[in-house]
Amino acid sequence: ALAQSFDGRYFLDHAQRDAAGELRPAGDISEIGQYYAALFGGLDLREPRYRRLRESITGDFAPGSGARDPRIVPVNAFIGVYLRLETLFRMGEHSLMLRDIEDFFGQMEAYTGTLWENRDFHGSYDHGFASYVASLLIASRQPPCQP
């Protein structure tokens, strides 16, 4: 699956069978798909072949970067932002993770003192799953685990 879906920069979201029954990549690419691959695909983003993907995760996909590839479907609050934060954490990019937490949740906290379900003014203004961010903040202050 990794070999079929990685195009040298991004992981394609899915494949479809052609008339002969062969699987062919459909060409759809989403930001969340990159995080799923990074977190659950058994790959090591430090490998040279994933350099461009790593650059996209740490740069192009960053909130407000303005460098986003127009083919990439961006993440939504749940679950995409959380997978982004977890990916940055596991990559050791704690300063980027902290910046993203501030960028995404800062206005929520300033407005209501809570973390919300969505980016905007609909849904829950005190969403339980948003507390996951606290676990990342605590973990980012701990020394790395030794394998």
Q: What name fits each language-model region?
A:
Residues A1-P147:
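Active-site core of glycosidic bond-cleaving carbohydrate-active enzymes
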